[in-house]
Amino acid sequence: MKKQGILHRDLAALIASLGHGDLVVVADSGLPVPPGVPCIDLAVTKGVPSFLPVLEAILSEMVVENATVAEELKPNEQIIEALAGRLKPVQLHFINHESLKTCCRQARAVIRTGEWTPYANILLYAGVAF
């Protein structure tokens, strides 16, 4: 039994299996998961677990070289600032929400949280540790 880090077996296995350039999506509770894309559903109730703590856990174990969110999230300055701070030195990129949903088709998995904030979704592209 693991005693630290990500304990969810499917999430831990996903991160361990990632290769350079692989896409993982951390999503709010409303993002549609494209057919054929695995969904690791962590949502329990409205807001539980929330987006940022799940993202923090993933970032503690995943090498990220690129991160993208929807332009529609920009008015939520609190989340944008939180994301920018947690992702440093990786720069946060923006695309429209429809394009973000299209990108999800290429994801290795969508991690569904209980987040209730509109557009609280992020595309994380795996980097390499060397």
UniProtKB/Swiss-Prot annotation:
SUPFAM superfamilies from the UniProt entry: RbsD-like
UniProt pathway: Carbohydrate metabolism; D-ribose degradation; D-ribose 5-phosphate from beta-D-ribopyranose: step 1/2
InterPro entries: D-ribose_pyranase (IPR023064), RbsD-like_sf (IPR023750), RbsD_FucU (IPR007721)
Subcellular location: Cytoplasm
A family per Pfam: RbsD_FucU
Domain of life: Bacteria
EC number(s) per entry: 5.4.99.62
Transmembrane segments: none
Active-site feature positions: 20
Gene Ontology biological process terms from the UniProt entry: D-ribose catabolic process
Entry GO MF terms: D-ribose pyranase activity; intramolecular lyase activity; monosaccharide binding
Predominant location: cytoplasm
The entry's keywords: Carbohydrate metabolism, Cytoplasm, Isomerase
Catalytic activity: beta-D-ribopyranose = beta-D-ribofuranose
Binding site for substrate: 28, 97, 119-121
Quaternary structure and interacting proteins, as annotated: Homodecamer.
NCBIfam families according to UniProt: PRK11797.1
PANTHER family per the UniProt record, alphabetical: D-RIBOSE PYRANASE
HAMAP family, per database record: D_rib_pyranase
Protein name: D-ribose pyranase
Organism: Heliobacterium modesticaldum (strain ATCC 51547 / Ice1)
